[in-house]
């Protein structure tokens, strides 16, 4: 049988049991899984599963080509050592099912193809076995699949981890926190329909049994400017559209909202309210359910939605200038809704939106705002309300996720697994303050990534006793220092500009940068650039040379966004809010605190430093996400875009670090188990230490000293070509081993089959001979007994039934009945019947009569009503004429028909004269006069009540059946007959003499219609009839050679008729 294999999206090579059936088996040493090395034979088609095995590992083109090959085969995961590289397929590959989770659960990292679940399981097992906190760092560009990867990790832990003792409440809250955070923190951008507009770090706490018992979420730098402004083709945060699309009518009415997003200023700027890939209505149902799961009360949900609605109403609040150019609120309806939703006084809110409170020398002064300032204050309030509500929402979720057993002694044994879903490096056509912060974050994480990767490599080498070799790589510390260094860094200069008195602007900030860090090799402005570079730099821009490439930032809005200014009277108004959530978001302590709050950049820098410390305290795992194209199309591989991401993710740096020492490393046990067949000394079993076996094996394979090193528990192979050569040799060895195994197996199988057949044949032959002997003896015994009984019965066959003749009598009876069954009569006319034995004569007669009745019954059931009527008439004709009328035998084979005249042959006047009386039978006849016997053509009609004689269109005579006394006919073959009527009937002139060509049929139907079957007289010689009052007529019948009807000299009607049948 030919071996058929197939590559599936997980990267596994599976054996197809039958090409036309869906049953498949994975190949591997354990019969279930394949190892990474098993896929090396297919490397020319699908690439290598670990970039470390690339021969030309320094070539970016080779790196991207390997990515392309795997992407083309729907293999979206590839390793760089322990780092997982994921390419977004933009479609569902069906590789995240429960079955896939079980495949990767509890399996060594390299025993299965690359997958997110392999990373998840490795991290989880390290968390449990080493009792050390872990962290999974997920990074990549917007739209690369970071949020989806985070959700898949949480799904894996929710499905595979043991349930806590108190049920799955924590597990459900961890999963349901995602839809809520996505609704309030994600939005549609040009690059991603579900882009996270904030950074997220989630800690999941596990007890000593490995069950999730709690969690905590940290959020970073929400893009709150999106609340008031979106670029073309982008949307605001999802929650606004979900509320409008999915909210109940009563809810929207209470919030003063309508369903059309085009009605709200904050939702129309991107001109992209509807997105085909987003179902806001169904997402709203998911969010509402999730809020319940994470312990939101109905009052809290109502307060939260009031805040969301208030942001929309703020966007629709408009101003107009009065005579002094001061702003005045013109949308009173919006103000009314805002007053109710925010829980503040209307007059206070109106004043706060149109005035600014200034404290000078201990005195409070109100300064009116112009239109531009009022719009700024309104937008600042909207951003502050939304961003602080988001912060409160994260804190609320954290309270829901907090473990309820934090005070118990077992709490000390908990471990933490961190999930970092942070925004990727961003380079847009116009880059502002948000991109500066995001890219600074990526610089810090890249610095941490290189440090931790080098550290883990060095620790492994030291643990294995391998000499550490220094690695050349780009250290981006110089860029991090450029941004964050005290006094000289960009953030310090930005803060200084924000805090200094006087007219500080974005351009003065840029000038300060040029004066302070103009000599830095990674910093450039229009003023500092050469003549050629100035063409690509405006005067209000500066350029940073990041590790991922150059990014040009526009300083417009830097100071404003860094200050994040909210006027004091707006804070005071919000602090007085009766909305419980806003009451927690705007604390009155802010009003009494005279200290200027930290700037946004400083807050972000401090939180980022804290995050770095958190990640350093944990054992890291990395998932690097790549977006294959900007159009979000499955199957499209944009090489330019991917090369850019490979660069800014530092994947080539990571690969160089990993390959600086050795490309491949494996435990001695695993290496020996896989390749032991290549050496006669280690095949088929090695009984010594695995390390000694590997030493013998590599010596036999001819490894050069510079190609490998032997550690304490692992073998290290420096070059991929060495591993490829070993793998190719293994493939050849497997072919020869397979041939040998097949030959041995075939011989063994055939011999075993022969021995089984031989044993079976002997057993069957022995059993069958015994069976035949027993059957033959039993048959002889039975035959002798039967013959003896038959002879005894034959001798006593005439005696009464007794035990001696009972068998013979029963046999005779049975034989007769069986023979009778084969010789039963086929029809009622068949009178044959087998001769019965004396003992069955009476039973035979009963059966014969029963059989005849049964045939008659079957025949009667089979005839139609018309045929039944025909037979009945024939039976009446037979009863009347059989043996009495000479021409009767000739009428027997002729069928009686219902009428001899069609409807068109009877004059309509006759039909009119009869009225509703139906005609049962009609026949043409010849009527003979009573005196001269002149023949006249007439029609005889039978109705239910009378015989009617018709001449053309006139009814000549009507004889009621009650007046019909009889019918006379001769015994010869003539066709004359006489209808006798009562002599007392004055309406009748006498009897009627008629001739019909169908005399038997006519007389039978007349007799049946008139009920005169017994009144038909068949006469010989002559018939006397009443010719009129007091006068009789005579018809004389004589046999002759031919039919002749004449008037005789004696005044009689003479009829000569031939004889048709001898009597």
From Swiss-Prot:
Pfam families named among the record's database cross-references: IQ, Myosin_head, Myosin_TH1
Main location: cytoplasm
Family: Belongs to the TRAFAC class myosin-kinesin ATPase superfamily. Myosin family.
Role of this protein: Myosins are actin-based motor molecules with ATPase activity. Unconventional myosins serve in intracellular movements. Their highly divergent tails are presumed to bind to membranous compartments, which would be moved relative to actin filaments. Involved in glucose transporter recycling in response to insulin by regulating movement of intracellular GLUT4-containing vesicles to the plasma membrane. Component of the hair cell's (the sensory cells of the inner ear) adaptation-motor complex.
Protein localization: Cytoplasm; Nucleus; Cytoplasm, Cell cortex; Cell projection, Ruffle membrane
Binding site for ATP: 88, 96, 139-148, 192-196
Organism: Bos taurus (Bovine)
Domain notes: Binds directly to large unilamellar vesicles (LUVs) containing phosphatidylinositol 4,5-bisphosphate (PIP2) or inositol 1,4,5-trisphosphate (InsP3). The PIP2-binding site corresponds to the myosin tail domain (PH-like) present in its tail domain.
Gene designation per UniProt: MYO1C
Record domain TH1: where: 885-1059
Domain Myosin motor: 47-731
UniProt entry keywords in alphabetical sequence: Acetylation, Actin-binding, ATP-binding, Calmodulin-binding, Cell membrane, Cell projection, Cytoplasm, Cytoplasmic vesicle, Membrane, Methylation, Motor protein, Myosin, Nucleotide-binding, Nucleus, Phosphoprotein, Repeat
Span list, region Actin-binding: 608-630
Positions where Phosphoserine occurs in the chain: 408, 536, 864, 1041
Matching Gene3D superfamilies: 1.10.10.820, 1.20.5.190, 1.20.58.530, 6.20.240.20, Kinesin motor domain, Myosin VI head, motor domain, U50 subdomain
Modified residues (N6-methyllysine): 383
Quaternary assembly: Interacts (via its IQ motifs) with CABP1 and CIB1; the interaction with CABP1 and CIB1 is calcium-dependent. Interacts (via tail domain) with PLEKHB1 (via PH domain); the interaction is not affected by the presence or absence of calcium and CALM. Interacts with POLR1A. Interacts with POLR2A. Component of the B-WICH complex, at least composed of SMARCA5/SNF2H, BAZ1B/WSTF, SF3B1, DEK, MYO1C, ERCC6, MYBBP1A and DDX21. Interacts (via its IQ motifs) with CALM; this precludes interaction with YWHAB. Interacts with YWHAB; this precludes interaction with CALM. Interacts with RPS6.
PROSITE patterns associated with the record: IQ (PS50096), MYOSIN_MOTOR (PS51456), TH1 (PS51757)
GO biological process, one term: actin filament organization
Processing and modification events after translation: Isoform 2 contains a N-acetylmethionine at position 1.
Presence of keyword Methyltransferase: no
GO molecular function: actin filament binding; ATP binding; calmodulin binding; microfilament motor activity
Domain IQ residues, every copy: 734-757, 758-786
Annotated positions of the N6-acetyllysine modification: 486
Gene Ontology cellular component annotations, sorted alphabetically: actin cytoskeleton; cell cortex; cytoplasm; cytoplasmic vesicle; microvillus; myosin complex; nucleolus; nucleoplasm
Protein name per Swiss-Prot or TrEMBL: Unconventional myosin-Ic
């Amino acid at each position: 049988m030919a071996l058929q294999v197939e590559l599936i999206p997980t990267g596994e090579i599976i054996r197809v049991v039958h090409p036309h059936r869906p049953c498949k088996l994975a190949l591997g040493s354990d019969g279930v899984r394949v190892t990474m090395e098993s896929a090396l034979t297919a490397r020319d088609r699908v690439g290598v599963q670990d970039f470390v095995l690339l021969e030309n590992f320094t070539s970016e083109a080779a790196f991207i080509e390997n990515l392309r090959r795997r992407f083309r085969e729907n293999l979206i995961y590839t390793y760089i050592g322990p780092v997982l590289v994921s390419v977004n397929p933009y479609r569902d590959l069906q590789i995240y099912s429960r079955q896939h989770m079980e495949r990767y659960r509890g399996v060594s990292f390299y025993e299965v193809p690359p997958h997110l679940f392999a990373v998840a399981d490795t991290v989880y097992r390290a968390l449990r076995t080493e009792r050390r906190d872990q962290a999974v760092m997920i990074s990549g560009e917007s739209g690369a699949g970071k949020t989806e990867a985070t959700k898949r990790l949480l799904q894996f832990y929710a499905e595979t981890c043991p349930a806590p003792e108190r049920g799955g409440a924590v597990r459900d809250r961890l999963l349901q926190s995602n839809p809520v955070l996505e609704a309030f923190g994600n939005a549609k951008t040009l690059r991603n329909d579900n882009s996270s507009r904030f950074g997220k770090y989630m800690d999941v706490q596990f007890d000593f049994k490995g069950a999730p018992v709690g969690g905590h979420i940290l959020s970073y730098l929400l893009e709150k400017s999106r609340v008031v402004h979106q670029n073309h083709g982008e949307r605001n945060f999802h929650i606004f559209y979900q509320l409008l699309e999915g909210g109940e009518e009563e809810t929207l009415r209470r919030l003063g909202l309508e369903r059309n997003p085009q009605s709200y200023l904050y939702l129309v700027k991107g001109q992209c309210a509807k997105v085909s890939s987003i179902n806001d209505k169904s997402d709203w149902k998911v969010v509402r359910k999730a809020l319940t799961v994470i312990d939101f009360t109905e009052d809290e949900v109502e307060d939260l939605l009031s805040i969301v609605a208030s942001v929309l109403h703020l966007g629709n609040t408009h101003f107009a200038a009065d005579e002094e150019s001061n702003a005045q609120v013109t949308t009173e309806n919006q103000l009314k809704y805002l007053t109710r939703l925010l829980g503040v006084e209307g007059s206070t809110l109106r004043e706060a939106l149109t005035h600014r409170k200034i404290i000078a020398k201990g005195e409070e002064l109100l300064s009116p705002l112009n239109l531009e300032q009022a719009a700024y204050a309104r937008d600042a309030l909207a951003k502050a309300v939304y961003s602080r509500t988001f912060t409160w929402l994260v804190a609320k979720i954290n309270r829901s996720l907090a473990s309820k057993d934090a005070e118990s002694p077992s709490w000390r044994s908990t471990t933490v697994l961190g999930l970092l879903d942070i925004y990727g490096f961003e380079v847009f056509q116009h880059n502002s303050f948000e991109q500066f912060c995001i890219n600074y974050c990526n610089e810090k994480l890249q610095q941490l990534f290189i440090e931790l990767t080098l550290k883990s490599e060095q620790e492994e080498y030291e643990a294995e006793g391998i000499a550490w070799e220094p690695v050349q790589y780009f250290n981006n510390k110089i860029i991090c220092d450029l941004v964050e260094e005290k006094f000289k860094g960009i953030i310090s200069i930005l803060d200084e500009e924000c805090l200094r008195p006087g007219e500080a602007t974005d351009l003065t900030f840029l000038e300060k940068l040029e004066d302070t860090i103009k000599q830095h090799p990674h910093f450039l402005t229009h003023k500092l650039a050469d003549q050629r570079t100035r063409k690509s730099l405006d005067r209000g821009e500066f350029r940073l040379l990041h590790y991922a490439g150059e990014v040009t930032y526009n300083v417009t809005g830097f100071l404003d966004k860094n200050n994040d200014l909210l006027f004091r009277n707006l804070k005071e108004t919000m602090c007085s809010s009766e909305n419980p959530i806003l009451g927690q978001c705007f604390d009155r302590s802010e009003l009494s605190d005279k200290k200027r709050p930290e700037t946004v950049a400083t807050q972000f820098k401090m939180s980022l430093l804290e995050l770095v410390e958190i990640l350093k305290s944990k054992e890291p795992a990395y998932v690097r996400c790549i977006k294959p194209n900007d159009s979000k199309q499955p199957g499209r591989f944009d090489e330019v875009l991917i090369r850019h991401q490979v660069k800014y993710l530092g994947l080539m740096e990571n690969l160089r670090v990993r390959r600086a020492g050795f490309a491949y490393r494996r435990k001695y046990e695993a290496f020996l188990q896989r390749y032991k067949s290549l050496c006669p000394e280690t095949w088929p079993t090695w009984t010594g230490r695995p390390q000694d076996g590997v030493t013998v094996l590599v010596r036999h394979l001819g490894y050069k000293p510079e190609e490998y090193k032997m550690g304490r528990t692992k073998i290290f192979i420096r070059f991929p070509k060495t591993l490829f050569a070993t793998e190719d040799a293994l493939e050849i060895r497997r072919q020869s081993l397979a041939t040998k195994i097949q030959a041995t197996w075939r011989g063994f199988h055939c011999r075993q089959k022969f021995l089984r057949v031989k044993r079976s044949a002997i057993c069957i032959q022995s059993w069958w001979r015994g069976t035949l002997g027993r059957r033959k003896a039993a048959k002889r015994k039975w035959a002798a007994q039967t013959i003896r009984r038959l002879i005894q019965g034959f001798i006593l066959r005439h005696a009464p039934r007794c035990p001696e003749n009972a068998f013979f009598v029963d046999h005779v009876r049975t034989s007769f009945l069986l023979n009778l069954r084969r010789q039963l009569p086929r029809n009622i006319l068949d009178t044959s019947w087998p001769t019965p034995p004396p003992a069955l004569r009476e039973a035979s007669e009963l059966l014969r009569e029963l059989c005849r009745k049964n045939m008659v019954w079957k025949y009667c059931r089979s005839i139609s009503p018309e045929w039944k009527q025909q037979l009945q008439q024939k039976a009446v004709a037979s009863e009347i004429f059989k043996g009495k009328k000479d021409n009767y035998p000739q009428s027997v084979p002729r069928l009686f028909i219902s009428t001899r005249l069609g409807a068109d042959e009877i004059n309509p006047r006759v039909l009119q004269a009869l009225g509703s009386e139906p005609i049962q039978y009609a026949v043409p006849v010849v009527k003979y006069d009573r005196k001269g016997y002149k023949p006249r053509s007439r029609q005889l009609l039978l109705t239910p009540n009378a015989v009617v004689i018709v001449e053309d269109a006139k009814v000549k005579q009507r004889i009621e059946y009650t007046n019909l006394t009889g019918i006379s006919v001769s015994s010869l073959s003539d066709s004359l007959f006489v209808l006798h009527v009562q002599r007392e009937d004055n309406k009748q002139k006498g009897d009627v003499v008629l001739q019909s060509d169908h005399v038997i049929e006519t007389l039978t139907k007349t007799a049946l219609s008139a009920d005169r079957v017994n009144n038909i007289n068949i006469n010989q010689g002559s018939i006397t009839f009443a010719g009129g009052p007091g006068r009789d007529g005579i018809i004389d019948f004589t046999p002759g050679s031919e039919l002749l009807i004449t008037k005789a000299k004696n005044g009689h009607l003479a009829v000569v008729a031939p004889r048709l049948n001898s009597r």
